[in-house]
Amino acid sequence: MEGEVSRKHPIDGVVPSEVQRFVLDRIDSIAQLEAILMMRNAPDTWWPSCTLAERLYIADRTCRSELDGLCQKGLVVAREEDIGWSYRYAPSNGELREFVDRLVYYYSHHLVPISNLIHGKPRTRIHEFADAFTLKKKDGK
């Protein structure tokens, strides 16, 4: 089952299953997690996507896509400004805020298991949809 927390995963016993579930449901990449960490440390700041992109060492276009994903999952909000899109940490409810706080704690104490959990996630439907438009040679490769 997609997004299911494995009972035999090395992260078990280190990170609570509900935090694992939050990661699987809400965090699609290390870039998203690192963006949340930065924005959470200055929650009243509107961060231009170009600034976050620079700090995350990713392209601005990629950064906007990652941040838009966080908006859809209720973790940040966005607004259009003269300089482009800006984002601010603003979980849509207290439960999400609490889960982010817990994730920050476990990520700071168990970086590798959390990173492995994120990297081990099944590909998202968006990636699968994008792959459908990848040009292929006549032999299908």
Question: PLM ranges: what are they?
Answer:
Residues 108-141:
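Exposed, interaction-prone assembly regions rather than primary DNA-binding/catalytic cores
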Residues 5-34:
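Short alpha-helical segments that sit at the start of domains
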Residues 26-28, 80-103:
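Short, cationic-aromatic polyanion-contact patches
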Residues 57-73:
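Short amphipathic alpha-helical interaction segments
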Residues 71-83:
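A short, conserved structural fragment
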Residues 25-29, 40-45:
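Short helix-capping/hinge SLiMs at alpha-helix to coil transitions
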Residues 2-12, 82, 88-92, 131, ...:
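Long, charge-rich, low-complexity intrinsically disordered regions
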Residues 35, 48-55:
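A short acidic, leucine-rich amphipathic alpha-helix
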